[in-house]
Amino acid sequence: MSQLLAGVLLVAITGVAAGGCSLVKDEQRRSARGSAGGTAAEVSREGVRDQAAVKPVGSALSASAATGGILIELPQSFTLTFEPAPHAGADEQAVLTDSAVLFAAWYQAIGRGDADDPLYGRYASAGVRAKLREIIAMFQANGWTVTGSVLVNRRTAKITGDTARAAWCADVREAFPMESSSGHVLHSPTGDQSFLLYRATMRRNGAGIWVASSLTSQRAAAACLPS
């Protein structure tokens, strides 16, 4: 079993999940980019935008509606929050934004109960897409969605050429699977296992999107535990 699947099976078994929102974000597409991928600001505009300190991403925020904006839709009872990475440069911010889109789109698919939701696939290689689809399908087969809240923090990115390494922590202590039909929440004890470290290798494609070519997770990671 992969580290990624093991990490999210913890979601299902112990009631810890990272997931979506009935939150709508319209963001600028990458159509204005030049052949070199455009500016970092343009590269980072599709998907979930970094927000000021620990502010929920979603309907509580006024998104900049732009031509060809993208929709992120997550369960009504769920909040996904990204802490900013103020020390990242413009290019690194583009990587962090695309990794955030991947993360949010994955849980959009979980929330919709649709393992074939196309959005997460735009930000993942075939191998990563297959891993994520397996997890989404598990939720779908059990009739689960997600509820509660997840905080994504300690986000980092390092770029070497057209390859980047991104990492982020997910605090999922307040997130749980919920039976879609009954609304029953699968509560369980939480602890250090509720802090997950995600690592992704990302490569920029011809459209300027940073796509995850590998993705792993680690539970109770020291780098993610509260100090």
Features from the language model and the residues they span:
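Structured, amphipathic secondary-structure segments that form assembly/contact surfaces
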Residues: V16, A115-P226
